[in-house]
């Protein structure tokens, strides 16, 4: 964990898939943006850095273990974080959950005072941990995560319930136990109940607001 307040502040939010990370990140972003303006705060999802699989067939893509650190291009993410800290804009990759690969599009992101970084595997990478000013782990029971994941993936990502359940049993739960849950030890703050924990969100808002003073 670094403390370089004169640079861009990187705040990491990790936890299981469908634990409420994105809800916390979006709530913090929306409420702080209303206070300081969107030119001062932004969000980067780790999912944008899934490796490009355009060279693989769709059959091969669906076999990828997306819950293993090797599925992520953390080197590119780390490079982009360093660029932002040095005042250089980045072009954020855009990942398609339907096609299981990156699209040709990118999103231009200018350096901000605060960047909220959210994703399941952020705390498994020592380089990313070092780049963060502080980190949060969203600690939500796996059965709740599973129910949320089924609803999300079926309604928003074009998945069938059978495929979601098969992936959960084959990779999501085992990888959580092997990689994600152990990475909780590196978090500075542990938040139970995800985005429903209003007290935790208010405490985090107060902490982040200090960086704008």
From Swiss-Prot:
Protein family membership: Belongs to the uridine kinase family.
GO cellular component terms, semicolon-separated: cytoplasm
Entry's localization field: Cytoplasm
Organism: Enterobacter sp. (strain 638)
Name of the molecule in the record: Uridine kinase
Pathway per the UniProt entry: Pyrimidine metabolism; CTP biosynthesis via salvage pathway; CTP from cytidine: step 1/3; Pyrimidine metabolism; UMP biosynthesis via salvage pathway; UMP from uridine: step 1/1
Keywords: ATP-binding, Cytoplasm, Kinase, Nucleotide-binding, Transferase
Annotated positions binding ATP: 15-22
Gene Ontology biological-process annotations: CTP salvage; UMP salvage
EC id: 2.7.1.48
Matches recorded under SUPFAM superfamilies: P-loop containing nucleoside triphosphate hydrolases (SSF52540)
Family matches, as Gene3D superfamilies: P-loop containing nucleotide triphosphate hydrolases
Listed GO MF terms: ATP binding; cytidine kinase activity; uridine kinase activity
């Amino acid at each position: 964990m670094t403390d370089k307040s004169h640079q861009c502040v990187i705040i990491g939010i990790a936890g299981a898939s469908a634990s409420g990370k994105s809800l916390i990140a979006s709530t913090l972003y929306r409420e702080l943006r209303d206070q300081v303006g969107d030119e001062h705060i932004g969000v980067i999802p780790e999912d944008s850095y899934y490796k490009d699989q355009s060279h693989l067939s769709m059959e091969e893509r669906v076999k990828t273990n997306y819950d293993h650190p090797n599925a992520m291009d953390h080197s590119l993410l780390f490079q982009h974080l360093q660029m932002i800290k040095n005042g250089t804009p980045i072009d954020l990759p855009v990942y398609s959950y339907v096609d299981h690969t990156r699209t040709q599009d990118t999103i231009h992101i200018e350096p901000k005072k605060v960047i909220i970084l959210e994703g399941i595997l952020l705390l498994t990478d020592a380089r990313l941990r070092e780049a963060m000013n502080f980190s949060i782990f969203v600690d939500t029971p796996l059965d709740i995560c599973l129910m949320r994941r089924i609803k999300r993936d079926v309604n928003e990502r074009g998945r069938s319930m059978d495929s979601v359940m098969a992936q959960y049993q084959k990779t999501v739960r085992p990888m959580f136990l092997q990689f994600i849950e152990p990475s909780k030890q590196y978090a500075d703050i542990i938040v139970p109940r995800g985005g429903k924990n209003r007290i935790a969100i208010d405490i985090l808002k107060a902490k982040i607001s200090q960086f704008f003073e």
